[in-house]
């Protein structure tokens, strides 16, 4: 029997919505990355985008364990000499775009190639409880119920 290889035309992409309220960032990001990549399916094929479209709501209510909220530092460089900049997770979560913490965590769990960039385009993160994807009829994925360690209250 030959190994099954999924073709792009055979894949049915589902829409999944995840409520990030009280969820631990790293544990949430692993579930999202697995869903985006399609590794939860029996028809997973390494060179094809077999994953789902994932919508994350309430990104501002996500939790970092330990003292990471104060101690975790995100770096970026301006491109100029000595232009290294840093921001703490607390600064980002309390700022205008708290969804970037989840986006960055998932981005760093995916491959850094053409397929990884394509798969990351299937992720939509919103800081509030509403999202504009109701027409796609997304199914709710309860990440808190998967493992008791996924949620902190």
From Swiss-Prot:
Spell out the Pfam families in the cross-references: Ribosomal_L13
Give the molecular function GO annotations: mRNA binding; structural constituent of ribosome
Q: Which CDD domains match?
A: Ribosomal_L13
- List UniProt keywords, sorted A-Z: Ribonucleoprotein, Ribosomal protein
Q: Name one GO cellular component term.
A: cytosolic large ribosomal subunit
What's the subunit arrangement here?
Part of the 50S ribosomal subunit.
Q: What does this protein do?
A: This protein is one of the early assembly proteins of the 50S ribosomal subunit, although it is not seen to bind rRNA by itself. It is important during the early stages of 50S assembly.
What's the protein name? Large ribosomal subunit protein uL13
Lineage of the organism: Bacteria, Pseudomonadati, Pseudomonadota, Alphaproteobacteria, Hyphomicrobiales
Q: Which gene encodes it?
A: rplM
